Each structure stands twice: as C-alpha cells, then as structure tokens.
C-alpha cells in the first residue's frame, strides 16, 4: 500500500514539473515573439521615416511644367503635384489653403511667374524652405510683351473710351459750377491724366512661355539643376532623363521648322484670345486674333468680327482657328460673316486646362498642334 502511494506522489510531481516547464517555455516563446514583433515594427517605422525624409516633393502650377518634372525625375525619389490638376484654367486659378500648405511642404515649387501668378510671391515668402523656379525669370531674355495687333480688341482702349465719355459728361456739368469748384476739378483732372499716363506705361508680358519648345528646353535644364541639388544621389539619373527628353524636344522643334516651311499660307487667324505668340514667332508665322492671350473677354465686337472675316476673304484662308477648350462661338461667327462660309474650324491646345487625368503629355499635345497647323495652313 505504501508503495502505491509513493508511486502516485512521484507521478503527480512529474506532471507538475512537466507542466511548469511547458508554461515557462510558452512564456519565453511569447516574450521572444513579442520582442520580434516590436523589432519588426520599429524597423518598418524607421524605413517609412527614412523614405519620407528622403522623398523630394515638387509642386507646379500648370500641366507642362508638371509633365517636365515627371519626365526628368523618372525612377527617382521625386513626387510631383500640379495645383491646377482639377482642370481649372491658369487664368482663373485661385490657390486654396491646401494649395498654400502644399507649397510650404514642398522642396521645389515651379511656377509660371506671369500676371496669373500674382499670388505666388506671398506664398513663397511664407515657405522659407522651398526652392522656387519662376519660369519667366529663367526665360527673361526670351520674354515677349503682349501685343495688340491690327483688328484685335484692346481692352485698354475700351477703358479709355469709357473714361473719355465720363470726362465729357463732367465737362458739361462743370458749366454750372463755381470757379473755385472748377479749379478743384482741373486739379483732379490733372491727377486723372497722371494716373492714366502711368497705366499706359505699364507693359504686360506674355506669360504663355511654355508654348515654345525652345523655352521648354531651357526650363527643363533649370529644373534638372535644382533637382540635382535637392537629391544629389540621383544626379546621374536626372541628367540621363534630361538628355533623353531634350532630344525629343529638339526633334519636335525640328519637325515644326521643316513642316511649317513653304506652306500655302503663313498666317494663322484666330477667332479667340491668342496665347500662341511664342509658338508662331518661333516659326515665322503671322497671325490675327480677336483678343490678346490673357484676355478675359468672351464676346467680340461687331468691328472685330467684320475685320477678321474680311481678312479671311482677303487672304483666301481655308481655316479659322480657336482654342480647344473654348465654345468656338467667335470662330463660328467669323466664318458666318465671310463670303463663302466654307472654312474649317480648327483647334489649338494651349495646355492651360490639361490635367494628369487626360492621358496625354506635353509632347503629344504639341504634336497635335503641329498637325492642326499643317492642315490649316495648306
């Protein structure tokens, strides 16, 4: 009996011993797994942090420069955001608080620098860590003033006409005023003339610089140099990408020169505002248009319509051009006022409303513009 009790006690002790060891092993295993998980999470977090620290953020405000940055930064650590990627035209764009924050958080900000970007300098001042590229400053030797040519509506002249009518009305009212009041009015008139003269002296520069392939090449070089400073380890890749892209720009520039030479017509007639001065000047083309490139006008005067229609008849033009993102109404009205009314309405794309969702590229759009010009000038 004593022997059986002894065996039972030994068996119980053995079970307790094995159970205790198993629990200890499980605890050690669980502790090891927890330690491994913490280590893995820490490593992942460090990798994500390093990736974020290493990433170069670029913000642009028009599709062409967005596309140039994308091309130059292929297979590198650069991310690009375009502020007008929702399809808003550059001339109508107003930055949101989110846009300003994007600029503040960016390493590089590429903007046009023209009349439509009057908000940009203040945004840059609030972003001390961002490097800014003003395209018009880069191209300062190539910048052209907006010009009002024959037949084109001059918004300043319309303003002057209204101002003159007001002066005539004031002059009539002055006949009933006292001499001392006349003296005050004369003083005010002198001031008005001074301010008006100052307004006339202001020259608005044409901001549509991206529509010249030659300008595109210069801006791309500047973008590349700045990316190399921001991310030196990818310098060779930036240079490689730039070289490949510039070759494409040069090839298309050459194609423009060759295919627009010796066309039947050398004049582009535009029933719209005209942002293509850099383009036509590059290839020695003449032009007529309803408005200057930055005009906000949408309806042309009777005189402008008649002038353009008569010019179509005079030159025997077979095509009337307009912007791809316009309603084409002015071009159609010009056509209806020509003698035979058989002209083709053709479009050119100014790239002001193109977005990354349009499944195209700067080069593709410029190629399409060439084809439209060739068809319209034959």
Which residues fall in each region the model found?
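Extracytoplasmic metal-acquisition and chelation regions
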Residues: 6-10, 21-378
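N-terminal secretory signal peptides that target proteins for export/translocation
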Residues: 1-3
């Amino acid at each position: 009996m004593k022997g059986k009790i002894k065996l039972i006690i030994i068996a119980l002790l053995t079970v307790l011993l094995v159970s205790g060891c198993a629990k200890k092993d499980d605890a050690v295993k669980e502790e090891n797994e927890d330690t491994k998980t913490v280590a893995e999470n820490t490593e992942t977090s460090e990798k994500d942090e390093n990736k974020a620290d290493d990433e170069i953020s670029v913000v642009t405000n028009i599709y062409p420069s967005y596309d140039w940055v994308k091309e130059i930064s292929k297979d590198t650590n650069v991310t690009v955001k375009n502020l007008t990627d929702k399809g808003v035209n550059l001339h109508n764009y107003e930055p949101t608080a989110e846009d300003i924050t994007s600029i503040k958080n960016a390493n590089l900000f590429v903007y046009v620098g023209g009349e439509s970007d009057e908000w940009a300098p203040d945004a840059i001042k609030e972003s001390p860590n961002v490097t800014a590229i003003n395209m018009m400053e880069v191209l300062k030797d190539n910048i052209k003033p907006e010009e009002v040519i024959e037949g084109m509506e001059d918004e300043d002249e319309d303003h002057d006409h209204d101002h003159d009518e007001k002066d005539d009305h004031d002059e009539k009212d002055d006949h009933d005023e006292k001499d001392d009041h006349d003296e005050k009015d004369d003083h005010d008139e002198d001031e008005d003339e001074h301010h008006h003269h100052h307004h006339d002296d202001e020259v608005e520069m044409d901001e549509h610089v991206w529509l010249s392939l030659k300008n595109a090449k210069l801006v791309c070089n500047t973008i590349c140099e700045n990316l190399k400073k921001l991310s030196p380890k990818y310098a060779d890749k930036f240079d490689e990408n730039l070289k490949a892209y510039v070759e494409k720009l040069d090839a298309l520039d050459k194609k423009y020169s060759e295919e627009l030479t010796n066309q039947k017509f050398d004049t582009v007639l535009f029933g719209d505002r005209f942002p293509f001065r850099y383009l036509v000047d590059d290839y020695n083309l003449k032009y007529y248009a309803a408005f200057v490139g930055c005009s906000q006008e949408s309806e042309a005067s009777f005189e402008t319509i008649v002038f353009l229609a008569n010019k179509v008849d005079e030159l025997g033009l077979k095509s009337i051009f307009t912007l791809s993102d316009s309603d084409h109404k002015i071009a159609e009205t010009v056509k209806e006022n020509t003698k035979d009314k058989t002209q083709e309405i053709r479009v050119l794309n100014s790239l002001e409303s193109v977005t990354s969702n349009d499944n195209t590229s700067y080069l593709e759009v410029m190629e399409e513009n060439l084809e439209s010009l060739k068809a319209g000038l034959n």
